[in-house]
């Protein structure tokens, strides 16, 4: 079945066109996402609607422009650029909030488009059926001309992003620095605007005005979960966009079938545009869940591991506090009844498994049911207690906390004290010997002892 589908020239042209369009929208969508303007694609896609209709009317009415794709693209891009200029005017001249300006331009231009559609419906019924493809998408009507156009736009987009990469990246992350370096960021911004408008206009027939903004957002959002580098995000985003477009096209054809309802044959056709967006949404969901950097599962296990490590460190601190009371070896019952154990673990039973792990790590030893710290465990516990008491000293001396209110904060912060931060705090506090409660602060060891 797969080979039969790809031998169909009509399917192959629409397949290539949609895949290339989705790859291009993903490229420029990455720029919008990093600039924190993902809704701009939604506004510009609706703003181009009246321009597309005017271009379609001219190509239908004027013999010189008969069935000219370039006329439609030109007026669509013009309307989209005007929409962007309108947003900028509302923001800068009328001090309108960004979101309000986006919404106003969206509804205003789209309203004009709806008025034009009502006119077209009465005077040009044949054209009316054709322009519905702009609103909802109709990938099956995309031929090799559209596929070639999509390929040209994709190649131009890749070249422009490569050529203007430095200007665009600097303008995104530090506009003032770009101005001070003399980089032509204004030209780069204009190029980005023109290409976004061109991509929207050339792609509305594949996904539709109502859904094309999803392809500007979903693939970059998926790629952002996997990398922090702009260049990597651009590449991954383009790949994801192409995959979503290809899957949407294939499944819209593969799952088309006929059935019989009340004796009448009915064709069940899955539209390409919604399927493309559906797969893009599934991809975002999978990346949000399974991303190895920021995915929900990764964060869940990272948090569980932190809590597990924190409890191990609390056990070591309990041994330290017992040593301060001259108890160097302790049995299970006395350990559980100690004040610090009750503070950290409440009424929980003796943690045999955690103690077993601490023994395996060489931090705790057990002899005749008596537990004690090893030299390695003592160094680890000293580092934790030092971190706790340094943080208490910092909060009291530098941030004017009451000394009776800092214990809880220090309990949370002691687990994230690095060697560099330890040195910084020691210098800032002039290497104190005692904390605000007049308890001795353990001295820093030269070697972290596996900490």
Curated annotation (Swiss-Prot):
Topology versus the membrane: Multi-pass membrane protein
Cross-referenced CDD domains: TM_ABC_iron-siderophores_like
Entry GO MF terms: DNA-binding transcription factor activity; protein dimerization activity; transition metal ion binding
Disulfide bonds: none
Gene3D superfamilies: ABC transporter involved in vitamin B12 uptake, BtuC, Winged helix-like DNA-binding domain superfamily/Winged helix DNA-binding domain
Keywords, alphabetical: Cell inner membrane, Cell membrane, Membrane, Transmembrane, Transmembrane helix, Transport
Basic and acidic residues biased stretches: 434-451
A GO term from the CC aspect: plasma membrane
Region Disordered: start-end pairs: 432-451
Transmembrane segments: 14-34, 38-58, 70-90, 100-120, 145-165, 192-212, 233-253, 269-289
Pfam families tied to this protein: ABC-3, Fe_dep_repr_C
Domain of life the protein comes from: Bacteria
Described purpose of this protein according to its UniProt entry: Part of an ATP-driven transport system CT_067/CT_068/CT_069/CT_070 for a metal.
Name of the protein this chain belongs to: Probable metal transport system membrane protein CT_069
Source organism of this protein record: Chlamydia trachomatis serovar D (strain ATCC VR-885 / DSM 19411 / UW-3/Cx)
Lineage of origin: Bacteria, Pseudomonadati, Chlamydiota, Chlamydiia, Chlamydiales
